[in-house]
Amino acid sequence: MSFFRITLHRSAIGLPKRTHGVLAALGLRRRNQTVFHPVEPQFAGMLMKVKELVRVEEVPHRLTKRELKDERKPDAGFVVEKQVRRFIPGVGVQDEVDFSKVVEELKAQKVENVEGVEKMVVEGGAVVRDGKRAGDLGVRTRSDWEVIGKMKSVLPKVKAL
């Protein structure tokens, strides 16, 4: 059995009582409220009376309130639409930077918070230098910064304090 998915798109403020009555009979009180009714002539007639105020779709089954809410919820996480071009001193502009070599070198030197190093390398060849921001990025100690400073040969973009 199919259903009408009816969503009140425009308010009925200032319209005749008859229009308010039709919306009440359909179960619509607030804007963007959605109700489901079976595809029957009586509901089709009501929809014709308020066709300027509602949006109607024919769907195969009713959705629960939870499913309606989940439809409005955005997808979790992030989507990389386009990677930012990066400037590396001595190399020039590159479309992609490979961090695997940097991370391997840091792990070999037993640097803690290796994941933070990937976050440290930012656009334009600059590194966040103040301690508060560095703490947010996961790089905790001055010795970590010194090790990173020694790695200019691996990735010239990473600089020490």
UniProtKB/Swiss-Prot annotation:
Transmembrane segments: none annotated. InterPro entries: Ribo_uL30_ferredoxin-like_sf, Ribosomal_uL30_bac-type, Ribosomal_uL30_CS, Ribosomal_uL30_ferredoxin-like. One of its GO terms (biological process) is translation. Keywords: Mitochondrion, Ribonucleoprotein, Ribosomal protein. Coiled coil: none annotated. GO terms for cellular component: large ribosomal subunit; mitochondrion. It is found in: Mitochondrion. The keyword Lipid metabolism does not apply. One of its GO terms (molecular function) is structural constituent of ribosome. Belongs to the universal ribosomal protein uL30 family. Component of the mitochondrial large ribosomal subunit (mt-LSU). Mature N.crassa 74S mitochondrial ribosomes consist of a small (37S) and a large (54S) subunit. The 37S small subunit contains a 16S ribosomal RNA (16S mt-rRNA) and 32 different proteins. The 54S large subunit contains a 23S rRNA (23S mt-rRNA) and 42 different proteins. Component of the mitochondrial ribosome (mitoribosome), a dedicated translation machinery responsible for the synthesis of mitochondrial genome-encoded proteins, including at least some of the essential transmembrane subunits of the mitochondrial respiratory chain. The mitoribosomes are attached to the mitochondrial inner membrane and translation products are cotranslationally integrated into the membrane. This is Large ribosomal subunit protein uL30m. The gene is mrpl33.
